[in-house]
Amino acid sequence: MSKQVEFDALVEEAIRQGDLANLRPVVEKELLHYDILFCLSEAGLLKSLTFQGGTSLRLCYSSNRFSEDLDFAGGPDFCSANLAQMKDCIEDYLGNRYGLEVTVKEPNELRAEPEYAEVKVDKWQISVTTAPERKDLPRQRIKIEVANIPAYTHTWRQLVRNYTVLPDGYSDTLIRVETLEEVMADKLVSFPATTNRIRYRDMWDLIWLKQQGATINANLVSQKLKDYKIDAFEKSLQARIDSLPNIIIEGNFHNEMKRFIPSSVYETSLE
């Protein structure tokens, strides 16, 4: 690898280019997202996975919302033993590129065989000490989650180059990603089904998906409900719809989105 890159200087330049001073934590995460996807793709570790979720919208479809974690569908035969090289791959690449302390925590138990009785999500947590001289700042943490459920659609898309400070080769990286229609189905299912917290970012994404021309595919939604073993969906959906006026009024939606969209987008969309 070429000489090390100073991560803090990279972040500062990305923030300056995009006028993103209020979003430093998610800009840091996004730069690391690019690194992680690039090194895993180069190592052939993404071949059996399909990128999904909010970060896939941001990095493959140019969504205006920043994201935190990397989510993939691995299919029913997935087990985390398939990705045994992931830890070393990420630690070596990020460590060598930035000279920072990087640790990857693997799933507690590597499953030798897939379990069909329930949805299983394996999580890797990546921790990067982005400012070693600042003991008061927390480490940057990113989760990679792979669920043993299928993706029913896919397309191949290049990573969107959101910053000119990124290496040229990053935007040549081809990622297998769900179609907008399937991401919409995922989010329609998860938005009302998560009862212990409100998924404000899913609200934003669903509106954005509609603006991009994505449509509701009833067959995909039905299949997702089966995959995730969700009951009483219509009741949960109606309850969530009924609660939307209060969700908007109480202010938590606005506060959440301030952390994930540029101030220019916030001012034109939510103020």
Language-model features, listed with the residues they occupy:
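Anion-coordinating catalytic cores for phosphoryl-, nucleotidyl-, and glycosidic chemistry
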Residues: F66-S67
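Structured mid-to-C-terminal alpha-helical surface segments
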Residues: M1-L49, C60-S63, G75-E271
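Glycine-rich beta-strand-to-loop/alpha-helix junction loops that act as flexible
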Residues: Q52-T55
